[in-house]
Amino acid sequence: MATESTTNTTTIIARADQHDIDLHKASDRVNFGSIKEPIDVPYLLGVQTDSFDWLIGNERWKARVEEDEKNGTNTVAHTSGLDEVFNEISPIENFAQTMSLTFSDPYFEEPRHTVQECKEKDYTYSAPLYVNAEFENGDTGEIKSQTVFMGDFPLQTPHGTFIIGGTERVIVSQLVRSPGVYFDRQQDRTSDKEVFGAKIIPSRGAWLEFEIDKKDQPQVRVDRKRKQSAIVFLMAIGMTKSEIAQAFKDYPLVLDALEKETLGTQDEALVDLYRKIRPADTPTPEAGKNLLDSFYFNTKRYDLARVGRYKINRKLGVEADFNDRSLHQEDIIATIKYLVALHDGAATFPGKRNGEDVDLRVDVDDIDHFGNRRIRQVGELIQNQLRTGLSRMERVVRERMTTQDAEAITPQSLINIRPVNATIKEFFGTSQLSQFMDQNNPLSGVTNKRRLSALGPGGLSRDRASMEVRDVHPSHFGRMCPIESPEGPNIGLIGSLATFGRVNPFGFIETPYRKVVNGHVTDEVEYMTADRDLDHVIAQANQELDENGNFVQKSALARVGEEEAVDVPVSSVDYMDVSPRQMVSLGASLIPFLEHDEGHRALMGTNMQRQAVPLIESERPLVGTGSEWRAANDSGDVIKSEKDGVVTYVSADLIRVMNDDGTTSSYKLAKFQRSNQTTCYNQRPIVHDGERVEAGSVMADGPAIQNGDLALGKNLLIAFMPWNGYNYEDAVIISQRLVQDDTLSSIHIEEYEIDARETKLGAEEITRDLPNVGEDAVANLDERGIIRIGAEVEAGDILVGKVTPKGETELTPEERLLRAIFGEKSREVRDTSLRVPHGETGTVIGVKEITREDAEEDGDELPNGVNQMIRVYIAQHRKITVGDKLSGRHGNKGCISRILPEEDMPFLADGTPVDIMLNPLGVPSRMNLGQVLELHLGWIAHSGWDISLDPNLEAEWKKLIPSGAEKAEPNTPVATPVFDGVKPEVLKGLLSTTLPNRDGDRLVGPDGKATLFDGRTGEPYTKPISVGYMYMLKLHHLVDDKIHARSTGPYSMITQQPLGGKAQFGGQRFGEMEVWALEAYGAAYTLHEMMTTKSDDVDGRVRVYGAIVKGDNLPPAGIPESFKVLLKEMQSLSLNVEVLNAEGVAIDMKDEDDDPASSADDLGFNIGARPDAAAKEDQKAEEPEYQ
């Protein structure tokens, strides 16, 4: 953030250090925030990169472990994920336990390809994983050691993504219930008594549930089976009655149950337990013991995980080591004691913490509390898949140990890596948590990587998720954003990590607080999990402080436990929030005046920023929040200098820097690449020759970034006024200027691919020589049959010429020999060229060709049966047009209804026409007042201001202006941080001190309104109108992608009705309700035509086509195909159905119609398949027929 301070907390300097601004290391915004943040926002992609570093145990992770050990903070896991999982599975022993296989020291070789190569050639960015495997033969004492290849392991790119098969993907973090012990309270259905229960939930293994029923009897449920006495269970795990009596001497409820228990020994208890769990089997004490051991005491099958042990220790006050991941007798005893204390209504429970006796609070658990929900990050998710793959491999190893000759066994011969590779590949390719990366703009990419999802394997399902799970919870504060969430069925199940949130080694989200000592706020910052919040009194970040950091007021508004915020004496405050934007996510923190927007609209605004399309020329917002710099900087879309140095060479695609240490660094820029969302990904240098850079300086902007600041849209002159009804119901009127100046134009790049395969009838061929195609259609193809770069193409144009052999029979060996000797006579081929699909157009900007020969030379991999693969890239220049969707940052979205000539737009007194007219009725009912305040501050920033122009030197609002923000030149970008922004009274004061224009006039008055003149008549409007600059975004919902029309096209094979949807070149559905509408009007002929000729009367539509071509009257309709399908369906149910005519005579329904194409030929005209419809043929599951 650009605000800085030394000791004085209230006075802040409004601009960043000029040195940093000059080096592109900070934003030059004038900041109106009044609160100094004691720490920087953590690295925004850390939630992805830190976790993967831990998994593979790389140098970055080792450095963090070293620092952690030095500081003694215990914020980093000290064993890497791969080491953990290989240690768990080792040793693999055979059934006789005479042989063992142990794994250790996993390591990676260098990746085979760079990230860029993987994107270009459809590879997976991965590195070979090796592990040291040691086989020991217990009979002979022989040990064989080998380094074993465990397959190619996908690696993370520096920006937290994975390249899988050439496409960029993100693994989303998952929100799940933490392992541990949970207590709940439920009302008994038959009586009014409350029934208390406890569940011990492991990370892996069977649940163990205890309950005190309505008769006050302690019960246990093993692995979700029948309930039985908890006393029997205690005896079964090895406790005698006297030991139980001693352990529970202070708990009469347990002692009463013990007296009533008739069983006397452990064996009897085991038999009783086994009988109830497995009623079909013969119960014996050994079987009972083996069953219990396999459920709860076998470390291979039962795992609490470190986090489960941590939660049990914390809840029950036991002190087992965090690495002890199994369940113990002490845990079970403590669980029952706590449950009895809860049942008896006790307030506290004796336990231990850090070696001291403490009284723990007794209460039921809230499962939606963030102390009980944890994050499975990318590293843990991949580790779990690896664990699954290795356990499958373990079975193979065991089998091979028994079948292979003991003398000849080597580690390599035992190991089969296929199951490991298959599980990892399946996870990256098909898991719900492995998502196609959102590359619409830099913000959408960062948000995608910071997303938290409660869905996925082991999580919730959207159909069964309750309102409670979806709702905002007090423990979300500073951890998960209460605003950013989808609007559909996933609302509340998918969230976003808060700005300052970070994930601790146990997977719980922590948020930072400033420590308060005796009413003095220090700069010491402590990160806390949600369950620690409850034990402290925490004040808000905007609590007023004096220059020494002491509270100005005697009392402060604070959170105490889970109660509503209350006023407390400042002496009792323990902590204070670090920043007002602490509670919201990055996306929400980019909305200026968020505090004045209603929640639902803020949610829409946050989501719509992610849909903004990068424009040809990016322009950063005049009114920002100060988060723009960080969002762009951490997105990975800017190029930053790695070392201090001087720029020696700059071109559009390369920057070279001579570093101070004598080395030279070269930085390659991405030029006009296609993103996952078909937007244009392009980087531009912002440094020049001879310029000094420091490590971390931004040297090149990415898409939707200007000078290192996020720039999603444009600053446009807005007037809030209706105009002839054209902006009714959120419609938007824009000026022709935005079209002709390419203000809101964007570039979209589509990729089209074709391959030439080996078929049964011979090889397909890429060629310019196509059957039945005129010279003009192949004019833009080169001699190979591939389109030239720079060609302008439209729907139906040929991009790559291809012919496929056609014929019914396979050639005999003799025929093939003769053809090989004498060359081919005119072979029967059909044209299967790649054509531009319907509705698409543009300029060819690139062609990539891979042939089998090239592939073998370069080591590229082409799929089996493919001889040649060609990709064509077409760029579209899309100007803003009627039907496109525009939006602001406050959920104020609208569709363009009219583009007015510039001269017809209303204009200001100096002749400046406005760019956009918005309907003022869009504000009051939506309650997103932030847009109006942004409008006014936008005008102030555009005009410039000088507070000395207000003659009242003692004006109260002037005291709220931070130092450095007293005056500014026109077009100075400003920042108004969320919840700490420009106050309305300051806004009013600044409006009265804006700089006059060159004529000496102030066009907008102190109330933010201006006199506008009608562009058509030149007359002034009767009332003044709110005018100012607002940041408007062009969203990805472009009319060019949605508009669609069809005359003839593909039909469904079964029903013979037109297919649906633009992708299939389908028709418009005339549904049930539309039929009712025609029925209501009695439009019988129209209705008849809709349901026969225009739908699925195959003969009829051919005859109608012929009649239209010849100019004849339309023939009567025939029988719809769907009627025949209905008859067939009834016949399949063994119903004999006959169709009778008016005279009652049975009509012979033809089973098979004549081929429609031949019927057409009989009528003397030809109807063929539309070439552009054929391009989408393979996208439909049902085989379409063409008419």
UniProtKB/Swiss-Prot annotation:
HAMAP family: RNApol_bact_RpoB. InterPro entries: DNA-dir_RNA_pol_bsu_ext_1_sf (IPR042107), DNA-dir_RNA_pol_bsu_external_1 (IPR019462), DNA-dir_RNA_pol_su2 (IPR015712), DNA-dir_RNAP_su2_dom (IPR007120), DNA-dir_RNAP_su2_hyb_sf (IPR037033), RNA_pol_bsu_bac (IPR010243), RNA_pol_bsu_CS (IPR007121), RNA_pol_bsu_protrusion (IPR007644). The gene is rpoB. Belongs to the RNA polymerase beta chain family. Gene3D superfamilies: 2.40.50.100, 2.40.50.150, 3.90.1100.10, DNA-directed RNA polymerase, beta subunit, external 1 domain, DNA-directed RNA polymerase, subunit 2, domain 6, RNA polymerase alpha subunit dimerisation domain, RNA polymerase Rpb2, domain 2. Its EC number is 2.7.7.6. Keywords: DNA-directed RNA polymerase, Nucleotidyltransferase, Transcription, Transferase. The keyword Transferase applies. It comes from the Bacteria. Transmembrane segments: none annotated. GO terms for cellular component: DNA-directed RNA polymerase complex. DNA-dependent RNA polymerase catalyzes the transcription of DNA into RNA using the four ribonucleoside triphosphates as substrates. The RNAP catalytic core consists of 2 alpha, 1 beta, 1 beta' and 1 omega subunit. When a sigma factor is associated with the core the holoenzyme is formed, which can initiate transcription. Residues 1173-1187 have a biased composition (Basic and acidic residues). This is DNA-directed RNA polymerase subunit beta. It catalyses: RNA(n) + a ribonucleoside 5'-triphosphate = RNA(n+1) + diphosphate. NCBIfam families: PRK00405.1, rpoB. GO terms for biological process: DNA-templated transcription. One of its GO terms (molecular function) is DNA binding. Residues 1150-1187 are annotated as: Disordered.
